[in-house]
Amino acid sequence: MEKPKLVYVIYIRTTLQKLWAAITKPQFTREYWGGLANVSDWKKGSPWQHVTEGKKPEIYITGQVLECIPPKHLVLTWADPDDSAEQSRVTFEIEAIEDMTCLTVTHGNFKAGSTMVRKVSWGWPRVLSSLKSFLETGKGLKVWAGR
C-alpha cells in the first residue's frame, strides 16, 4: 500500500523573500501559525522546532533541515517530539510568478497507520490560509479557534 502524500498549492501576492521570511523567521511565523514559532538556523543538518515562546517553551513539532536553498526550497523532517519514530517529511517549493508567488507544500513519508496524517491534513489548510492573509493584509487568521 502506498504511503499517503498531501500536496497543497497556494498563490500569494508577495515576493519570494517575504514568503521565505514568513516561513523561516519566528517573528513572522507566530503571526499566522497560532502563536507558534519556527526556530532554526536553517542550515542543512540543523535541528528545527515549532515551538511556543516564553519562559517555558513548549515544543509541538521537531525535526531536521534536510535541504535549504533560500528563498525557493526547504525540506524538513517533521515529528511529534513525544514520538520521533513517527517522522514524516515536508517540502516547501516557492516559485515567483509575475507579481505573486506559488507555494507548494508537500507532506509525505508518513509511517503506515500514522496519526500525524489526520493532524496535518486538518492543520495545513488553516496554516496556509492564515499565511496568505498575513502576507497580503498584515494579519493572520484566527483559524485555531475551536481547536
Task: Identify the function of each model-found stretch.
Residues V39-A79:
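Glycine-rich portal/gate segments that line the openings of hydrophobic small-molecule binding cavities
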Residues S133-R147:
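Short, highly charged C-terminal tails/helix-capping segments
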Residues A79-P125, L131:
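Beta-strand/loop substructures that line and gate deep hydrophobic ligand-binding cavities in soluble
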